[in-house]
Amino acid sequence: MNLILLGPPGVGKGTQAKLLIDRFGIPQISTGDILRAAVKELTPMGAKAKGYMDSGALVPDEVVIGIVEERLAQEDCQKGFILDGFPRTVPQADALGQVLSGMGKSIDHVVSLSVDKEELLTRLTGRRACANCGAGYHVDFAPSKVAGVCDACSGQLVQREDDKEETILNRLSVYEAQTAPLIAYYQAAGVLRSVDGLGTVEAVQGDILAAIRA
């Protein structure tokens, strides 16, 4: 099964991907992770990416696509994969389709997880991390025993810059601008499966499984 997970920051893609990995025994492919790995291993595409990164430039789509292609050619992807955070744009989706076609493969399902903006803000702005040991908490869903104090080391709990409302609203705006065309793209291809991400982890997982088996 070849699967793409789409959804805004905070919707729960990472959590759901882990459950799907365990169920189907296929790897999760995150572009950030494979980019770092390719650069570290100095694969042909990793070497190209390193040149851009060392100069402070954005890695162009054709190099990112090349790194994705290198990863998809590996043995553990032969029975399927879960793409998380890629593609982000219609040109990337077109390029991915061409790469997969050359391998005799295609995307089976694109699961689009959605949650309303207020819920996403609650999930993301409530995150806290220990400034000392890095332990994670949430003011609503996983609070520390003493407000603002780490259970593990008594360090101070802080809100990261990435979890502040202004930053999150900007990330959501960028996501919406990039991804709305992608949703239409995969809907037209007949592979889009829309799933409500509001619910327990188990309930959302059940809805995903039902959607891809329908």
From Swiss-Prot:
NCBIfam families reported in the protein's UniProt record: adk, PRK00279.1-2, PRK00279.1-3, PRK14527.1
Pfam family, one: ADK
Domain statement: Consists of three domains, a large central CORE domain and two small peripheral domains, NMPbind and LID, which undergo movements during catalysis. The LID domain closes over the site of phosphoryl transfer upon ATP binding. Assembling and dissambling the active center during each catalytic cycle provides an effective means to prevent ATP hydrolysis. Some bacteria have evolved a zinc-coordinating structure that stabilizes the LID domain.
Catalytic activity line of the entry: AMP + ATP = 2 ADP
Main location: cytoplasm
Quaternary structure and partners: Monomer.
Coiled coil: none
Descriptive protein name: Adenylate kinase
